[in-house]
Regions:
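Methionine-biased hydrophobic packing positions in alpha-helices, especially
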Residues: 6, 45-46
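Non-catalytic, surface beta->alpha helical segment in thiol-disulfide oxidoreductase systems
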Residues: 59-66
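Short alpha-helical
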Residues: 13, 40, 65
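Local sequence-structure signature of Cys/Sec-based thiol-disulfide redox active-site neighborhoods
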Residues: 1-31
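Thiol-based oxidoreductase modules, predominantly thioredoxin-like and allied folds used
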Residues: 28-42
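Thiol/disulfide oxidoreductase modules built on the thioredoxin-like
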Residues: 47-53
Length: 66
């Protein structure tokens, strides 16, 4: 399975729901990037996705949104 990356925050209820859905679908190795912990990663997310909201999810190189 390709790498799954999710830009998230520690307090985002939608991120929690997205993580639970991914786990239900069999994703065991979710890479979470907490943009509230590391502001430089927020800039990375906004540059990469063109969006400011979380969650933002990538499966491999494919952006599936949030």
């Amino acid at each position: 399975m390709p790498e799954v990356l999710m830009y998230s925050t520690r307090v985002c209820p939608y991120c929690v729901m997205a993580e639970k859905l991914l786990q239900k679908k069999g994703v065991l190795n979710l890479q979470k990037v907490l943009i509230d912990v590391d502001p430089s990663r927020r800039e990375e997310m906004m540059t990469r996705t063109g969006r400011r909201t979380v969650p933002q999810i990538y499966i491999g190189d494919h952006h599936i949104g949030g």
